């Protein structure tokens, strides 16, 4: 039984045991493109990946399943070397603690996503990045593009082109790196981890 066959079983909920960690060769491989029209198996896998992210962000389900909260997941992280990523970025509460009008600023499963253009300006998160596949803290600015245009297909086999900036752009670039065999710390300057080149945007 393949990893995907196990993951898409009706009763299976993806948990931390399904997520492979650094050192596993799948994380360093360039993942294969999915074929269209999408197979039921690939559609279900995408739905299971999104379900994991929702569970991970839910305090009750997250604790019950022992999950680390995540905003993105790539198929290679669950040992499936395919170009599928799921992104779930919640909107924050307002200054008075009221819930946002829209729960998520991005909620999408992207098949065969690719960056087709990007800004000259770089950006990095002030607090650095983490990863569900990396069980240690690696400090430093993860240098990425401040703005990207991404093409992808959805589960209905429809093609989309979206422009992203800020945190959403960072998250999508992190996940696209996974399908290209790249981990976030590859983008940290080893000699000077907190080097901020002129014009680089630091996102809080």
UniProtKB/Swiss-Prot annotation:
Its EC number is 3.5.1.88. GO terms for biological process: co-translational protein modification; translation. Its cofactor is Fe(2+). Binds 1 Fe(2+) ion. Transmembrane segments: none annotated. Keywords: Hydrolase, Iron, Metal-binding, Protein biosynthesis. It catalyses: N-terminal N-formyl-L-methionyl-[peptide] + H2O = N-terminal L-methionyl-[peptide] + formate. It comes from the Bacteria. The keyword Hydrolase applies. GO terms for molecular function: metal ion binding; peptide deformylase activity. The active site is at residue 175. InterPro entries: Peptide_deformylase, Peptide_deformylase_sf. Fe cation binds at residues 131, 174, 178. NCBIfam families: pept_deformyl. Removes the formyl group from the N-terminal Met of newly synthesized proteins. Requires at least a dipeptide for an efficient rate of reaction. N-terminal L-methionine is a prerequisite for activity but the enzyme has broad specificity at other positions. Belongs to the polypeptide deformylase family. HAMAP family: Pep_deformylase (MF_00163). This is Peptide deformylase. It comes from Streptococcus equi subsp. equi (strain 4047).
């Amino acid at each position: 039984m393949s990893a995907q066959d196990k993951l898409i079983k009706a009763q299976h909920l993806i948990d931390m045991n399904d997520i492979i960690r650094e050192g596993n060769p799948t994380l360093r491989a360039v993942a294969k493109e999915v074929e269209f029209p999408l197979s039921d198996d690939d559609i279900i896998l995408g739905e299971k990946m999104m379900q994991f992210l929702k569970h991970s962000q839910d305090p009750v389900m997250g604790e019950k399943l022992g999950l680390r909260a995540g905003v993105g997941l790539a198929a290679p992280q669950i040992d499936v070397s395919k170009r599928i990523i799921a992104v779930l970025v919640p909107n924050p509460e307002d200054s008075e603690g009221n819930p946002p009008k829209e729960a998520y600023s991005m909620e999408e499963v992207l098949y065969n996503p690719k960056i087709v253009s990007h800004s000259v300006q770089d950006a990095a998160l002030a607090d650095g990045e983490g990863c569900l596949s990396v069980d240690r803290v690696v400090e430093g600015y993860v240098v990425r593009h401040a703005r990207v245009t991404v093409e992808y297909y959805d589960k209905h086999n429809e093609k989309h082109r979206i422009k992203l900036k800020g945190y959403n752009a960072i998250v999508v670039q992190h996940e696209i790196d996974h399908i290209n065999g790249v981990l976030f710390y590859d983008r940290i300057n080893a000699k000077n981890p907190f080097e901020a080149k002129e014009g680089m945007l630091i996102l809080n």
